[in-house]
UniProtKB/Swiss-Prot annotation:
GO terms for molecular function: tetrahydrodipicolinate N-acetyltransferase activity. Keywords: Acyltransferase, Amino-acid biosynthesis, Diaminopimelate biosynthesis, Lysine biosynthesis, Repeat, Transferase. It comes from Methanopyrus kandleri (strain AV19 / DSM 6324 / JCM 9639 / NBRC 100938). It is an enzyme of class 2 (transferase). Its EC number is 2.3.1.89. Catalyzes the transfer of an acetyl group from acetyl-CoA to tetrahydrodipicolinate. It comes from the Archaea. The keyword Acyltransferase applies. CDD domains: LbH_THP_succinylT (cd03350). It catalyses: (S)-2,3,4,5-tetrahydrodipicolinate + acetyl-CoA + H2O = L-2-acetamido-6-oxoheptanedioate + CoA. This is 2,3,4,5-tetrahydropyridine-2,6-dicarboxylate N-acetyltransferase. GO terms for biological process: diaminopimelate biosynthetic process; lysine biosynthetic process via diaminopimelate. PANTHER family: 2,3,4,5-TETRAHYDROPYRIDINE-2,6-DICARBOXYLATE N-ACETYLTRANSFERASE, ACETYLTRANSFERASE. Belongs to the transferase hexapeptide repeat family. DapH subfamily.
Length: 245
């Protein structure tokens, strides 16, 4: 299969639909027989990871399968479990695979999105499957970059902004944000919109139509209010120092 970030909508839908739905949980198990319990867990749970302590076992595996085994074990005194999802179709990305990027705690990035060099993803930001983000772009706190969105280089996506994704309907065109665009806090860019190079989207704007390059748009729905001038450039300047690793 091609990389997920290169799949068309129908292929992405098929991938999500056909992916095994998993609920991976971590269990802390108090037991009077850690070695024996660990051995039995490994025998009965093929994909589980088991770690043994002096009087406990830690198990990471499919929730329902682990519970079934633990409930059948007399050596288990009690257990505590941790999980943050249910029937997950697409896992989160392995953040260690991204190079030359900064991902702050609490950011959520799904499997195999594309992040360019120097990308910064702030706390609470969400980047969905199939999205592509160019070099030097910052995704600020609680912003959402939807499925298949294409974001260029040196873009700033403001806090709480939403770049709409396009899996439903599958015929919809993805959002395209060209290079050097600044998107203000809580702005919304709807499906199929292209924002031209160097444009500025004001805070709170709802963009329903394409934005020409080097224009400022504002309002609901967003309308062109002026050209990007020196004053606007000064107010929306991208700071390279914030993208240093």
């Amino acid at each position: 299969m091609r990389p997920l970030s290169e799949l068309d909508p129908e292929e992405l839908i098929r991938y999500i639909s056909e992916s095994p739905k998993r609920t991976i949980a971590k269990f802390y198990v108090k037991t009077d027989d850690p070695e024996g319990l660990a051995e039995r867990l490994e025998e009965r749970l093929e994909d589980a990871k088991v770690f043994t302590g002096v009087d406990h076992v830690i198990v990471i595996g499919e929730h329902d399968d682990v519970v079934e085994v633990l409930e059948s074990e007399d050596s288990v005194e009690y257990y505590h479990k941790e999980l943050d999802h249910r029937n997950r179709a697409v896992p989160l990305a392995d953040y260690s695979e991204f190079e030359d990027v900064r991902i702050e705690p609490g950011a959520i990035i799904r499997e195999k999105v594309k992040l360019g060099k120097g990308v910064v993803v702030m706390m609470g930001a969400v980047i969905n499957i199939g999205a592509k983000i160019g070099d030097g772009t910052m995704v600020d706190m609680n912003a959402v970059v939807g499925s298949r969105a294409e974001v260029g280089k040196n873009v700033h996506i403001g806090a709480g902004a939403v770049i709409a994704g396009v899996l439903e309907p599958p015929s919809a065109k993805p959002v395209v944000i060209e290079d050097d665009v600044v998107i203000g806090a809580n702005a919304v860019i709807l499906e199929g919109v292209r924002v031209g190079k160097g444009a500025v989207v004001a805070a709170g704007a709802v963009v329903t139509e394409d934005v020409p390059p080097s224009k400022v748009v504002a309002g609901v729905p967003a309308r062109v209010v002026k050209d990007v001038d020196k004053k606007t450039e000064a107010k929306t300047q991208i700071v390279d120092a914030l993208r240093c690793l």
